[in-house]
Amino acid sequence: TPTCGKTIKALISLLLAALAGATLGHAASAPLNRLSEDVLDVVPPSSRVSGPPGKMTIRQGSCRSIGLTDIRRRIVDVATQEWGFFGFSVVDQTSQDPERSSPRSIHRPPRLAPWESLRVADSIAGYWTVTPDRSWIIERQNRVWSGPSGPSARWRDPWSAAFISWVMCEGGIAEPNQFRRASAHHVYIDQAI
């Protein structure tokens, strides 16, 4: 419906903006545990996979249809819970960075530390489980984890689109005609346009 389409477009914009701030982080607090299922009925992404890094397999890839009642609030709640799980990271691009030698120097956002990469590995794998590319992405990451860097290796593939796909899935949007889950942002942005 037209109203649903406008809502989806607004939610995509909101999630992309939040994701830009949430995953690049300069300032972050300690990560929080997720809320219990009786407080926020969400399938934790980590429960969608099993096994340790290097031997991870997919347990669940489907999304449940919850209905469109109060969907905006649910999507925001799901995304906020994950932001807390990652420590409420915030990027302030309006301030000067004293470590940059000049305004034109390359700025690279901080990455997760090896211990943090290991802590969130199954959650990020869980995000991938709702995308069409889930099997080969997780298999390729298993090979990375089995390599020289070991289980604390960072994700080989950018996972922000998988995260947004998972948020929309857990938000209750199960039908591809409402939101096409994907491993690349352009897929659902094209759908929204």
Feature annotation, model-predicted:
Residues 30-31, 49:
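Extracellular cell-wall/glycan-interacting regions and their flexible linkers
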Residues 181-193:
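...with weaker cross-activation on analogous glycine-rich loops/strands in unrelated enzymes
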Residues 36-178:
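N-terminal capping segments
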Residues 25-29:
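Boundary at the C-terminal end of the N-terminal hydrophobic targeting segment
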Residues 13-22:
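Bacterial N-terminal signal peptides
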Residues 2-13:
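Bacterial N-terminal signal peptides that target proteins for export
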